[in-house]
From Swiss-Prot:
L-glutamine binds at S56, G255, G257, L285, Q288, N326, G328, F329. InterPro entries: Anth_synth/Amidotransfase, CarbamoylP_synth_ssu, CarbamoylP_synth_ssu_N, CarbP_synth_ssu_N_sf, Class_I_gatase-like, CPSase_GATase1, GATASE. This is Carbamoyl phosphate synthase small chain. It holds the Pfam family CPSase_sm_chain. The keyword Ligase applies.
Length: 401
């Protein structure tokens, strides 16, 4: 009879320590070190590179419920943050399975090497279903994720750091995610066998100013695909400076952090923009900013919405859409003032997902209609906004669908 090798387990090289003292051990991936952040879970099956580079995830550790992440590697085309060198996005990641060698014709770099290059700390080899269930029952926790190849950790110190972190409430992260200076965007959406295109100067019919709270590239591409030249301006740009650019419309972008904190400087600007009668469109944090600007309130959610399979009802059409979401705060529907209508609602929990000002060309949605990753059910919202620009120019409306 041959002897069998004794049962062995790998020494933990990474840890997730929750604020309540829970310690989860795993195998480290990506960058080494430690970081305090909020833990959330994302239910999308694809698009991990877009998710991890979404600036809205700044200050968060993303747990992927899909077990196999990294199979198709990474590339330079799927990055979503506007300035990749700044590496704005998720600060930590948690996977069920080890990262395998990539197998895809578009793969340029292994996900582990990509995480290292971006400074993202990761942990794999844990029961992500159990962690997701914990978050679902208890809410998104503050935590510390740590990675040491030698497996040396001061657990008590990590517990203290996790407990001491104040969390996302009251935190203005848009100031970190925003661009440092103004820029012009002309890249159009990706086309099979052609890649991304460029909107020529002669083809730009409309001028949109994007207030950048942490904007995603695919949002800007969809504007360019509808013949909009986009000028991206930093989050703290004044209404006077925005109007001096003579835009046909203004876009309020997505972004991270507590909307109430960002609203300290953004809300007065948006209120002045509303008075200008220009068309205004907001997404995600931009939606929350608009809500605050009209007098509504925002609130921290129990676990947030993060995924590409969320059902939302559009009251303006009566249709249900499957959309991509990524937010931990929401506009309180009950706080919407007279003259402001709720246009969309989540069919998961009834939270607000859209609003418009009656009698003004101003509207916003909580979800991500640019579908990166995710379904394209809500692409019509970009055409709805462009139709407001066309109306001001006396042009016929585009078909929304």
């Amino acid at each position: 009879m041959t002897e069998t090798a004794p049962w062995t387990t790998r020494k933990p090289t990474a840890m997730l320590v929750l604020a309540d003292g829970t310690v989860i051990e795993g195998t480290g991936i990506g960058a080494t070190g430690k970081v305090q952040a909020e833990v959330c879970f994302n239910t999308a099956l694809t698009g991990y590179e877009e998710i991890l580079t979404d600036p809205s995830y700044l200050g968060q550790i993303v747990t992927f419920t899909f077990p196999h992440i990294g199979n198709v590697g990474t590339n330079e085309e799927d990055i979503e943050d506007l300035t990749p060198a700044a590496r704005r996005g998720a600060v930590g990641v948690i996977f069920k399975a080890d990262i395998t060698d990539p197998s895809n014709f578009r793969a340029v770099k292994h996900l582990d090497a990509w995480l290292k290059a971006r400074g993202v700390i990761g942990l794999c080899g844990i029961d992500t279903r159990a962690l997701t269930a914990w978050i679902r029952e208890n809410g998104a926790p503050n935590a510390v994720i740590a990675h040491d190849p030698n497996g040396v950790f001061d657990i008590e110190a990590l517990k203290a750091e996790a407990k001491a972190w104040s969390g996302l409430v009251g935190l203005d992260l848009a100031i970190e995610a925003t661009s440092g200076q103004s820029s012009t965007w002309t890249e159009t959406p990706w086309v099979w066998n052609k890649g991304y295109g460029t909107l020529g100067e002669a083809d730009a019919k409309y001028h949109v100013v994007c207030v950048d709270f942490g904007v995603k590239r695919n949002i800007l591409r969809l504007f360019a695909g509808l013949d909009c030249k986009v000028t991206v301006v930093p989050a703290q740009t004044s209404a006077e400076d925005i109007l001096a650019l003579k835009p046909d419309g203004v876009f309020l972008s997505n972004g991270p952090g507590d909307p109430a904190a960002t609203g300290e400087y953004a809300v007065p600007v948006i209120q002045n923009l509303i008075k200008s009668e220009l068309p205004i469109f907001g997404i995600c944090l931009g939606h929350q900013m608009l809500g605050l600007a009209v007098g509504a309130k925002t609130e921290k959610m129990h676990q947030g919405h993060h995924g590409a399979n969320h059902p939302v009802k559009d009251f303006t059409t009566g249709k249900v859409e499957i959309v991509s979401m990524n937010h931990g705060f929401a506009v309180d529907t009950k706080s919407l003032p007279e003259g402001v209508e709720e246009t969309h609602t989540s069919l998961f929990d009834g939270t607000n997902c859209g609003l418009r000002i009656v009698g003004k060309p101003v509207f916003s949605v909580q979800h991500h209609p640019e579908a990166s990753p995710g379904p394209q059910d809500s692409h019509y919202l970009f055409r709805r906004f462009v139709n407001l620009l066309r109306e001001n120019k006396g042009e016929a409306a585009l078909a929304e669908r």
